[in-house]
Amino acid sequence: MSVTASDLAFDQRHIWHPYTSMSRPLPCYPIESASGVELQLADGRSLVDGMSSWWAAIHGYNHPRLNQAASQQLEKMSHVMFGGITHPAAISLCRRLVEMTPEALQCVFLADSGSVAVEVSLKMALQYWQARGERRQRILTLRHGYHGDTFGAMSVCDPDNSMHSLYQGYLAPHLFATAPQCRFDEEWREEDIAPFAALLEQHAGEVAAVILEPVVQGAGGMRIYHPTYLKRVRDVVRVAIKLLLIADEIATGFGRTGKLFACEHAQVVPDILCLGKALTGGYMTLSATLTTRHVAETISNGAAGCFMHGPTFMGNPLACAVADASLALLAENRWQAQVSAIETQLKRELLPLGRCRRWPHVRVLGAIGVVEMREPVDVAELQRGFVERGVWIRPFGKLIYLMPPYIIEAEQLSRLTAAVADAAR
């Protein structure tokens, strides 16, 4: 079915796209199909995808093994409630998750999206302390962080970036430490942890957990910080009052930074781990929140007798089957060479741009490449130019960045980096 001019007019008038004004909507480009690393426009042009559909489609599009997993599961059942029922797809997926994550993380809660995974992690932390008889209700997090758009997740996002002022009185008043300043490739400076440690000491009796994005702060600014900061956070949290550490790896999990999980850069094991995005290879919405048996049993032995959360589509068999197939692909370990090759090429083709005074900073880690401008970019104008060049890149704020599928070829990646370089000029 082709998209007509009438369809686009309907879309513009009636369909509310993410972060888009209904009175002044940004242009939308109709995609009719996708395969490998290319998106097929309705007018026949193809675009090399540099976004992995917001960082999720790590294996590319229309992957035969993921298609097969979805098709086979669809013939059995697309959905069944998860309350009082289980099924092979969920069991196999959770077994893989337990095997590939740190040994301490033994209990898996499946949910609908990354935002919900964060909601689940925050509820776990609050219920954990209630079960222990302590009234700890605040979360300590970092400036420039992003954890999702639902109310609980928003409450631990950067107050300025997430416009907390719009929802004053509704969002919980949490604690925000100064974001780490020491970059990944710089020499570690111990004073970088001081604002975090001071804030935690000041509010030690109130804090239930610390939540952060390990090493890479994603939608809050694509900031790549020193792994030692994460290690020192873990040390401060453990030594001080044994608070729970929540790692939001929704954007970084499953190889994006060059490690399977970004926490591995600092050899840190969190108490709660949030996963999403690439979990299904970008096919369907699904997330997972993993925690230790200690946390799970403490919650279960509390007054409620259980963890108080249960989405309608929890453990959806179709999503679980595709996620299981996606993780099976990762387990074959081709991603390591793929991400390493992407990182090498991004450094070769993007880092020289950092010599220009117009760009405060160009940074690369794993399959992430970021060019930061001095002023906010014109998203609509840049997007139009990118499409004309046959690439799909979605800038935001001051940033033009790439997070391509792992299967991208060198020539395709060069088309993306060349487009970024030209746009930045």
Curated annotation (Swiss-Prot):
Homodimer. Pyridoxal 5'-phosphate binds at residues 114-115, 248, 311-312. The modification N6-(pyridoxal phosphate)lysine is found at residue 277. This is Adenosylmethionine-8-amino-7-oxononanoate aminotransferase. Belongs to the class-III pyridoxal-phosphate-dependent aminotransferase family. BioA subfamily. Its EC number is 2.6.1.62. GO terms for cellular component: cytoplasm. Pathway: Cofactor biosynthesis; biotin biosynthesis; 7,8-diaminononanoate from 8-amino-7-oxononanoate (SAM route): step 1/1. Its main location: cytoplasm. GO terms for biological process: biotin biosynthetic process. InterPro entries: Aminotrans_3, Aminotrans_3_PPA_site, BioA, PyrdxlP-dep_Trfase, PyrdxlP-dep_Trfase_major, PyrdxlP-dep_Trfase_small. Gene3D superfamilies: Aspartate Aminotransferase, domain 1, Type I PLP-dependent aspartate aminotransferase-like (Major domain). Keywords: Aminotransferase, Biotin biosynthesis, Cytoplasm, Pyridoxal phosphate, S-adenosyl-L-methionine, Transferase.
